[in-house]
Design a protein with these regions (language model features):
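Short helix/loop capping segments that flank catalytic or ligand/cofactor-binding pockets
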Residues: 53-55, 93, 169-172, 261-263
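Extended, solvent-exposed, turn-rich assembly/linker loops in the middle of proteins
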Residues: 123-193
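Extended, compositionally biased alpha-helical segments that mediate assembly or anchoring
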Residues: 240-275
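N-terminal "assembly arms/tails" that initiate or stabilize quaternary assembly
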Residues: 1-74, 268-273
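Alpha-helical scaffold segments that mediate packing/assembly in large oligomeric complexes
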Residues: 86-152, 270-275
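Short, surface-exposed beta-edge/turn micro-motifs
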Residues: 41-42, 155-158, 218-219, 249
């Protein structure tokens, strides 16, 4: 097949498909945290300390809060996901095959995005482990208390990412899964969505969490507030296709430029939980 006979519409469909698949099925964590686009190599996220109100004497000066300002820096990294496609194989590709190629690149970049976010959250000093029984009601209530005592805002941006084993443990808790306790509108599977609001957190299963412990009997999970972690984006997912005459093949390259950073350790808990 001659290079000039490659359909431009095919290339455009491929590029659009990779980006849409990445947004829909790739990263599960990116949309839950702070994001900044258009970053040039390096950026700074600001962490502002707590302010305190004071009184003043009549006609007296108002004492300033003197808010603490802390800078958190992150440097972008480049990531690639490429695949060779033989020219003559184009005759064998149908729309299903193209979709497989699109999703493969999207999943690879999506997994890498979540890896960056998990790596940032792993640097937290806050922990809440349960390596004997896994998730229990007592453990979940203690997690709520930890966030409350840290004054982490209860504003709908608290999340808990758990492994599928921990998700099964949650479903065994009547307080999590029975309408007698939470109401029918808060059941774990409304319209097939695998996520649930409980105790002020959005709980959801994640298949990419690392194993831990002796013989990998535990899984490293995370509870976090969306503003406590940040993700910087220099270049979102893009795709291009080039023909290489010496291989009589096309190289499909998907790439992105991103990185993540922890902003506030009090808002991110790393949790080693029994499977």
């Amino acid at each position: 097949m001659a290079v000039s006979s490659i359909s431009t519409s095919f290339i455009e469909e491929f590029e659009s498909g990779v980006h849409m698949a990445y947004q829909r099925m790739g990263s599960k964590l990116r949309n839950t945290i702070r994001n900044r686009s258009g970053v040039k190599n390096k950026t700074t996220f600001q962490k502002i300390g707590k302010g305190f109100a004071t009184t003043k004497a009549r006609h007296g000066a108002i004492a300033p809060m003197n808010l603490d300002h802390t800078n958190v820096n992150v440097t972008l990294e480049d990531y690639f996901a490429g695949e060779w496609i033989d020219d003559l194989d184009q005759l064998r590709i149908n729309h299903d095959e193209m979709l497989v190629a699109q999703q493969s690149g999207a999943y690879a970049l999506g997994r890498k995005t979540d890896d960056l976010i998990k790596a940032a959250m792993t640097t937290t000093s806050s922990t809440h482990n349960e390596t004997t029984n896994g998730i229990t009601l007592v453990w979940a209530l203690q997690l709520m208390e930890l966030f409350g005592n840290n004054e982490v805002p209860d504003d709908g941006k608290r999340f808990v990412a758990v492994g599928w084993e921990q998700w099964s443990q949650l479903l065994d808790l009547d307080e999590f899964s029975r309408s007698n306790y939470i109401g029918e509108d808060q059941l774990p599977f409304p319209q097939g969505v695998t996520a649930k609001q409980w105790l002020g957190f959005t709980w959801f299963p994640h298949s990419g969490l690392d194993e831990a412990g002796s013989s990998n009997v535990d899984r490293v999970c995370f509870a976090y507030h969306g503003d406590a972690v940040a993700h910087a984006i220099g270049a979102d997912v893009t795709s291009n296709m080039q023909y290489h005459n010496d291989k009589d093949s096309y190289f499909v390259l998907n790439k992105m430029q991103m990185n993540s950073v922890l902003i506030d350790a009090e808002g991110v808990f790393k949790m080693q939980l029994k499977k």
